[in-house]
Swiss-Prot record:
The keyword Amino-acid biosynthesis does not apply. PANTHER family: 54S RIBOSOMAL PROTEIN BL35M, LARGE RIBOSOMAL SUBUNIT PROTEIN BL35M. Belongs to the bacterial ribosomal protein bL35 family. One of its GO terms (cellular component) is cytosolic large ribosomal subunit. This is Large ribosomal subunit protein bL35. The gene is rpmI. Keywords: Ribonucleoprotein, Ribosomal protein. It holds the Pfam family Ribosomal_L35p. GO terms for biological process: translation.
Length: 66
């Protein structure tokens, strides 16, 4: 049986930590930020951990090696 390939869309969007948590970048920073406060924009920086239920789905369906 051939190796399982990771879905390339998931590869670009998610990262799995050493402890098995799934990290993702928060949405809402592409355009229209003139309406947001500086604090809101600052809080969207960096990465966030995905909730456990969603993380399980991501690992199961999109990242076969994760």
């Amino acid at each position: 049986m051939p190796k399982l390939k990771t879905k390339s869309g998931a590869k670009k969007r998610f990262k799995i930590t050493g402890t098995g948590k799934v990290l993702y970048a928060q949405a809402g920073k592409r355009h229209g930020m003139i309406k947001r406060t500086t604090k809101q924009i600052r809080n969207l920086r960096g990465t966030t951990t995905l909730f456990e239920g969603d993380a399980a789905n991501v690992k199961k369906f999109f990242l076969p090696n994760g």
